[in-house]
Amino acid sequence: LLSCLDVKLFGATFAGCTNVSVHGPVQINHGINIWKDNYIYSEQITSPFRNEASNKASNTDDDPDTENSMTTIGRQSRLEEGHYLHHFSVNPGNLDDISNIVGEGVKLSAADIEKLKVGMRRGVTWYDSASKAGCENEMLVWVELKEGSMLVLPSFATLINLEEEKDKDNGKCVYDFEALTNKLEDIKSSVESVEVYYNKQTCILKNLTKEVKQYDI
């Protein structure tokens, strides 16, 4: 069970002869839309599935034209534009207890962390479907604390500001990191590194210090 990367990262509960509960090191909070507008529109949709039960009730099973007309009509709502920010934390120490039982192999490795970072910064863009059309990853902010640090960072949801107006020259979203930069300055003795991965085609970053490593998402 613990050889599976998703279990090592997000945890699991296994009920069998012996009950095992793994509290995952990775915890992700609900997303908060930090864009100024929340314009939601709705549109009418029809179900692509045949309504066989209705056909039988009306004894029209042998009439294909009637069957094709039996559709379910509903509505779906969509957000015109939103920028959702999810705070998350990674605490490898969550696996200490279970590793004492089954061995060191269940601890998170550097390779595991790299796979997590790739998934977080590209997963939404890769997951393309009708319901997810138009959704793309925009940014990943990664703050690594020094070995042995017991510091608990606050949610970044209130420390990263998306300006109300896009850049007038190129229409890019402007993210202001002033509040987060000030917070990290206060705790810099506990911080090992700060990395920001962002989509350079859609974003502009402000008030990041030169110590912050910036990469294309």
List the predicted regions and their residue ranges.
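Basic polyanion-binding and macromolecular-assembly surfaces
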Residues: 1-217
